[in-house]
Amino acid sequence: MATRFPKFSQDLAQDPTTRRIWYGIATAHDFESHDGMTEESLYQKLFATHFGHLAIIFLWSSGNLFHIAWQGNFEQWVSNPTGVVPIAHAIWDPHFGKGAVEAFTPEGGAGPVNAAYSGLYYLYYTLGMRFNSDLYQGSIFLMVLATVFLIAGWLHLQPRFRPSLAWFKNAESRLNHHLSALFGVSSLAFAGHMIHVAIPAARGQRVDWSNFLNTLPHPAGLAPFFTGNWGVYADPQAGPPILTFIGGLNPATGTLWLTDIAHHHLAIAVIFIIAGHMYRTNFGIGHSIKEILDAHKGPLTGEGHRGLYDTINNSLHFQLGLALASLGVVTSLVAQHTYALPAYFYMPQDHTTMAALYTHHQYIAGFLMVGAFAHGAIFFVRDYDPKANENNVLARMLEHKEALISHLSWVSLFLGFHTLGLYVHNDVMLAFGRPEDQLLIEPVFAQFVQVQSGKIIEGIPALFGGPGVTAPGEFLTGWLGSVNANNSPIFLPIGPGDFLVHHAIALGLHTTTLILVKGALDARGSKLMPDKKDFGFAFPCDGPGRGGTCDISAWDAFYLAVFWMLNTIGWVTFYWHWKWISIWGDNVAQFNASSTYLMGWLRDYLWANSAPLIGGYSPSGGTNALSVWAWMFLFGHLVWATGFMFLIAWRGYWQELIETLVWAHERTPLANLVRWKDKPVAMSIVQGRLVGLAHFTIGYILTYAAFLIASTAALYPNGPAAFTPAISAEQAKGVLSEFKAKPVPGGVMLLLPENIVFDFDKSSVKLDADPALNRVVGVIQFYGSEPVEILGHTDSLGEDAYNQKLSEERASAVKAFFEKKGIEAERLTAKGYGETKPVAPNAKPDGSDNPDGRQQNRRVEILIKTEVVPVS
């Protein structure tokens, strides 16, 4: 006889209604509530799932490696990392028509592909991989490892290999293992890989299994390591540096120094391996965590930390809450470090990938943090023992929870009214034609902190640190240069717009925290319902008969906090994205001017950057490489809006809807073959909220993901069929004005100064010239099929023949760039004039050199042969 779902609850399995399905899904992972579950079997099952989880991670990583090696273009990309678009995998989709196949097929490609925005190419390259064979080997290794871990998970569920409860409760041994083995040894292994493989690869030396054992990374061997003389490894006189303490970013790559990264991981390894031997285990030596906690009593803390050892050690929810909070903070830091201190070669030049990774990690951090508070609330309901925690810090926190909640409430109200008040005031001033009367507040405290960390800002003193204050030699040699370099990502220039959005984000963070803290601290009881813990609050939330009980459980706080968390992460990512596309596009002035009022955010960030999504596909315009994101943008809105149907409509509506749907289904021929035996009942309020929250969340993130990737890829094309959106006449006028365009006989002439496009005396287009040239591409596309001449010019220094050749090569390089962006080759002509057509004197009247004049003469001119010149 088949066992009805759910097997873990006989009560639910015998329920004759559809509640059986919904409650079964809702409690599938609530192992504590399952039939026959003991504390020991609970720990054993969770332990086994860890192996399964790791196996899935290894399998996922293996699949990434395998598909890039099989269907990607890794070796081609390695040969030109800034010029070749990385490919994630091929697309085999029977729904694709001719237009889609062409749009997603790169030039010279065999078929449609997906561009990679994951950053994996940059990771693999930085790790020292250079060939597809390296990727295949890594994939096979991880596949084997996944298999081993699956077997290990199964093995630890067998009676002979199940660890005992005492083994799980041995906190000191577990901590030693985590510190030494997991953190320490894994950091040591990574440092070893960096030193033996990645650093030599960056220097052009290949180290693989064939020469790994006989290729020394440093002539001094291990003697300096074990004698503590690590400085030898940084000394260029002693050999190629492998461990350094330079600081900042390598100016040649814009990323962290690999030798600094190796040093960091080796130091972490040593510290953690030592730390993992501090606690008392089998040998009776070392620290006892319980003794430390019991002895730790600070002022005004009552019994201090007495009782916390057993409270934490006996509560999986407490442990999970701590782990989720820690991981949430780390994940948000990863997002910040990805752009401020990037580690992977060439990734800072891939703007779409940088935007995707930042946003991805901030959203994950948000969910982890909300989860931390959710499990904190469950701890208070299920695991908290008031007698074991009398007058300790945990009990005292519960006793003064009203002070915590009221202070958070005050901070949230203050931030909300003042921040919104400033924004609205500025909107009113602009709407009434008085922009000069905006309230613009400089973030002087933040700028002061930047200066104390080494940044030089005129007018702000370095009182506690920085050049001239910190003792010579205390700053890392590379740090000051990196912090103060042009377009340094470490400390961005900030102004009134940053000040306002910073406080808007602070509002979101404090309000989210208020809801979560109140939900957790009130989980056992509140003024309204002091004995709340005695009522269970299972999923139905149809109440134990008291009014309002559906809105005061910890679950409801979690539910409401998710909306605020999403708002907050939305503001964070909006801010990051707009700030960075203005920096990449050398258009910081627009951000500074428009970010101080709400209409500026709506118009100049959201609406202006929606163009590639709104015009993503049409009967007349056809399909392009961003069409799928335009479709996803629409679909995300649909999912998000569906959420409101669940969130606003209540029980009576659901009862009618579900019964109507079931009645209709039961009268179809197919449904009569397999009769639906469960009696339909409406969802509970909580279930309706859960479904609504899921739709709202997924739609919200999907909509912004599509917007983020398509808008960034359109500005900085990094797709197999680069798409630059058509621009309006007004936008074309702005670009023409930016490049000092002027009407000339036969058309309009744009001026590209040398310093925007080329390095001095070079003919290859600079990496950071993309944004400027992309705007020119938009203007060329605006003019449809009009022919374009690209004219190169130099100054008079050097031989005539050399200058002629340089001017021709520069014109050809710009022509090649335009072709790569989709401008038809037959429209483009490249010509070089050398020094023959100066626009300013190369020498002053007295015969001396005229550097300003020579700089004006080193230029590329774009002549669009048209009669329509939208220049004011």
Curated annotation (Swiss-Prot):
The chain crosses the membrane at residues 46-69, 135-158, 175-199, 261-279, 316-339, 355-381, 403-425, 499-517, 557-578, 626-648, 690-710. Its EC number is 1.97.1.12. Residues 745-868 form the OmpA-like domain. GO terms for cellular component: photosystem I; plasma membrane. It holds the Pfam family PsaA_PsaB. Phylloquinone binds at residue 654. Chlorophyll a B1 binds at residue 637. PSI electron transfer chain: 5 chlorophyll a, 1 chlorophyll a', 2 phylloquinones and 3 4Fe-4S clusters. PSI core antenna: 90 chlorophyll a, 22 carotenoids, 3 phospholipids and 1 galactolipid. P700 is a chlorophyll a/chlorophyll a' dimer, A0 is one or more chlorophyll a, A1 is one or both phylloquinones and FX is a shared 4Fe-4S iron-sulfur center. The PsaA/B heterodimer binds the P700 chlorophyll special pair and subsequent electron acceptors. PSI consists of a core antenna complex that captures photons, and an electron transfer chain that converts photonic excitation into a charge separation. The G.violaceus PSI reaction center is composed of one copy each of PsaA,B,C,D,E,F,L,M and Z, and forms trimeric complexes. Belongs to the PsaA/PsaB family. This is Photosystem I P700 chlorophyll a apoprotein A2. The lineage of its organism: Bacteria, Bacillati, Cyanobacteriota, Cyanophyceae, Gloeobacterales. The gene is psaB.
